[in-house]
Regions:
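Intrinsic disorder in cytosolic terminal tails and internal cytosolic loops
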Residues: 10-15, 260-269
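Hydrophobic transmembrane-helix bundles of small-molecule transporters
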Residues: 1-89, 97
Length: 269
């Protein structure tokens, strides 16, 4: 009966449902995202003409969504809610670093260190295990800032270790590097998810979570392009150190961004 009443109510308001859709906003958002991804995928040979197109599509998206009563992307809310926008930036940056290591380190283990794909997978296994353990611990932590700060510091420490690592490194060093990047993966995931939950408006939680996932995907795509840029046809010690330099600088920026974010002082909801 309740479902029937809901169906009858929906049937009586088809225009309301149609008005809540935003096909142009969806198209502009998709166009902006796809164009940005195409640029990021070719960082070795940048397609510079795509950048003006990204700017035009992004500007059109912002202009259109500001005038919608039910926008697909609430850009007005994002402009006003700097804490949430900062969380997206922090999440995307953290996963850019994590994906650089997750895929770039494994490739280096095979190409430069000479490990088989099976052995390289075993070396990377502690990274996944550490991430799983820290996800459980992070979910039970009341604060938000402390886990995210620890995650950023660990990413910086892991990057520093990679800078000192070469193809003659011992197995203990290789495993330590994997663990150092696995721990912050779990902490960053649960910490940023808690931040989104605390900072997003009550009625827009689903859209806010979707934008967080989008930030993570952009980080993954950028990481894949950077790996190709640093390694070329084959991973080397020099390529690993170049990657570690970039991830180290990003990690330091992440520490500053996290420590300086006053919005993270509030606990979880």
């Amino acid at each position: 009966p309740a479902a029937a009443r809901a169906a009858d109510a929906d049937a009586q308001h088809p225009r309301g449902r149609a008005a809540s859709l935003d096909p142009l906003g969806i198209a502009l958002f998709t166009g902006t995202l796809v164009t940005a991804m195409l640029f990021l995928l070719r960082l070795d040979r940048p397609l510079w003409w795509l950048l003006p197109l990204v700017a035009v599509l992004g500007g059109a998206l912002a202009w259109w969504e500001r005038r919608r009563t039910a926008p697909f992307i609430d850009v007005t809310m994002l402009a006003r809610n700097r804490a949430l926008a900062t969380t997206y930036l922090r999440h995307g940056t953290a996963y850019l670093i994590i994906y650089c290591v997750m895929y770039g380190y494994a490739q280096w283990l095979e190409d430069a260190h000479g490990l088989s794909s099976f052995t390289a997978g075993l070396v990377m296994l502690p990274m996944s295990a550490a991430a799983a353990v820290c996800s459980l611990l992070g979910a039970r932590t009341k604060g938000i800032r402390a886990p995210l700060t620890v995650a950023a510091v660990l990413l910086a420490a892991g990057s520093g270790l990679l800078l000192l690592t070469g193809h003659h490194a011992s197995m203990a060093v290789l495993l330590s590097a994997a663990v150092l990047f696995g721990l912050p993966q779990g902490l960053a995931s649960t910490g940023n998810q808690a931040a989104v939950y605390a900072q997003a408006p009550a009625g827009g939680m689903g859209a806010a979570a979707g934008l967080q996932r989008t930030a993570q995907y952009l980080g993954a795509i950028t990481a894949a392009s950077l790996i190709g840029l640093f390694y070329g046809p084959r991973a080397t010690d020099g390529g690993l150190h170049d990657m570690a330099t970039v991830t180290g600088l990003l990690s330091v920026a992440l520490v500053l961004l996290t420590v300086g974010d006053r919005a993270l002082r509030a606990g979880r909801r």
